[in-house]
Amino acid sequence: MTRQRRLRILSYASLWLLGIGLADASAFQLQQRPAEDYIKLMDRPDRVVKVDEVITKLQLKPGDIVADVGSGSGTFSIPMAKAIAPNGILYAVDIDQKMLDYVAERAQKEGVTNIRTVLGEYDDPKLPVKDVDVAFFHRTLHMIEHRQTYVDSTAKYLKPDGRIVVIDRNRVDSGESWMWLEQSDVDTWMAAISFYPAEKFSVFDDLYFVSYQRPYGNSVLLKKREARRD
């Protein structure tokens, strides 16, 4: 993997907002564009459908600590920050400083004061706290080179009952392998750090949406629930 691709590894995930993909050639062209160009693409109204439904399913509450890993232009960061206000903190994590600057500016314009930007590393989100309630990966994990290492690193920042939430796409018939990520593989990486599927949500036709947790408290194994589309 080239250094240029590694430098964009988290930010590119946002190009596939909510399962709306691009053709292979276009995707590779977009990867070469500066941050300013694909911010415009990510902020298009047709790319933010179902954000509210996702936020509702997450059942965030005021005071929660949330990490939006691969935050991109802040499509999820802003509404999640609002959901956990006034005393919750949203950490927008990216490895592209220009994207983080954009999120900070966007938050200021919208009067959102509880977002903190974090410049992550290739194998570690580098969060400044270890009491995170939710680490949220929207179309991000499949873009990370060392996935097991990254989820290992992420887990150390979570509370004992913290959640790792993954939205991604299973194998597709065409396209490069980096465009998808089998849920079974994610299950395996999570199990290696004692995280298991706690909830599955049917929000998207072409994406899986799974919340992972450790067995916690008196529970021998977290109950798996299938949440149907309203």
Would you name each region that the model predicts?
Residues 26-67, 73-75, 102-105:
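Class I SAM-dependent transferase core
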Residues 65, 89, 161-163:
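Short glycine-centered segments of the SAM/dcSAM-binding site in methyltransferase folds
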Residues 67-125:
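Class I SAM-dependent methyltransferase SAM/SAH-binding core
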Residues 81, 148-163:
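A short glycine-rich, Lys/Arg-flanked "PGG" loop and its adjoining helix->strand segment in the class I
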Residues 125-135:
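A short acidic, Gly/Pro-enriched loop at the edge of an enzyme's catalytic core
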Residues 133-147:
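A short SAM/SAH-binding and catalytic strip from SAM-dependent methyltransferases
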Residues 163-188:
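Conserved class I S-adenosyl-L-methionine
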Residues 199-230:
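Core SAM-dependent methyltransferase catalytic element
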